[in-house]
Amino acid sequence: MISKAGSRTYERAHFPSRHPRLSTMERCLLKWAVIDRDDRVLDVGLGNGLMAEYLLRNMECEVCGVADDMELVRSTRGLVRSADLVYAAAGDIPWRDQAFHAVLLRPCRLDESAMENQLREVHRVLKEGGQLVMALENLPAPLRSALDAIRETPAEVTENITRRRAMKMLSQLGFEQFSWHPCGIFAGALVAWKRNTVEERFKKGEGE
């Protein structure tokens, strides 16, 4: 029986890299992600599959992914055969509580309620002390309004959540230690950490 680590080694040896060209945003997400060998990492959205492939080949971590596009899931499975990739709605991440050390979240056009549900699910599946790296547009309001007017998006989909609003949502859910890392002029990576209540209780006990 091949172990997870063995399957990653086999994949690197028998399925040569396509020398993927990661997008600027994907490179930004990977730059600020704190990932150790054998960590479990969740890629929410999957994109074109190149970031999941990069994680598997270069970070030696266990890669999982979820997207609400079945064709995207199928195509990404062809790139990263040892990753656990599933089809599910944005607000329904089908893994147990505290399953992941890190979650990488791509920019997506969800209304505020749907985004809050998605972030709540991210918080649920992250381990205490786990990291979220979230890609966000950071457009000035006039430019954002102009782009929204010309984009072909369904009527029920509103503008992207702003950085300030995302931080407020995350804080209410139990994230802390926020940092913002620009990626180009109008986008960036928002980093947040799930509050570690066990560590807090331990420190509180030491102080008493």
Give a label for each model feature.
Residues 1-34, 50-51, 133-155:
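Conserved class I S-adenosyl-L-methionine
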Residues 48-92:
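Class I SAM-dependent methyltransferase SAM/SAH-binding core
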Residues 91-103:
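A short acidic, Gly/Pro-enriched loop at the edge of an enzyme's catalytic core
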Residues 102-114:
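A short SAM/SAH-binding and catalytic strip from SAM-dependent methyltransferases
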Residues 116-128:
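A short glycine-rich, Lys/Arg-flanked "PGG" loop and its adjoining helix->strand segment in the class I
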Residues 157-173:
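Short alpha-helix
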Residues 173-208:
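Core SAM-dependent methyltransferase catalytic element
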